[in-house]
Amino acid sequence: MISTTNTGSTIPTLATDRLVLRPLANGDVPGFVEIWSDPEFTRHIGGRGDPDAVWHAMAGNIGCWPLTGVGPWAVVERPTGMLVGRAGLWTEPGWPGIEAVWFIRRDRWGRGYAQEAGTAAIDWVFGERPHLTEVVSVILPANIASIRVAERLGMTRTRLQHLHGEEHAVYTVSRAAWLATRASAARPTTR
């Protein structure tokens, strides 16, 4: 079971070589409406691209931070300042653990942004939570692109689990395995 406590903390901003992971903001709604209006995008993660649905999804994402101490960030491309997706961490009661999550707008697929953002999020959470033993990713088995990202992040499929009415594959990386592969890499900078 996940305990829900108000951490009172602010949401950090992370920076990688090509991306900034910053707190979600009301001004992101139009960008996320555009992303969620792409049927090829929503085929794998669901949702719909109307402003009310996007706003409510963002409110839930933002609410994850004070309730659990983790949550997703807006992913912004550094050179252009363009909102290109959402990535970070997620958990809720009944969830298999703290989950690394990501999605990138379709015109930016294939650039490694999901892996870069996922790496930053996992580095951050293992750095902030010294007693956390693993991070998971919950992926629909047909979402081959996300499975490949999880595998590039060093995750392995550990089980199937029925969540939100569908069967999902749960991928896991342990703290020990993560730290062993990241020993020579620096954590993302926090601004």
What does each of the following model-derived ranges do?
Residues 56-58:
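Short Pro/Gly-enriched beta-strand edge/turn motifs at strand-loop
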Residues 1-47, 72-191:
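Acyl-donor (CoA/ACP) binding surface of acyl/acetyltransferases
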Residues 51-54:
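Short amphipathic alpha-helix in the helical subdomain of ABC transporter nucleotide-binding domains
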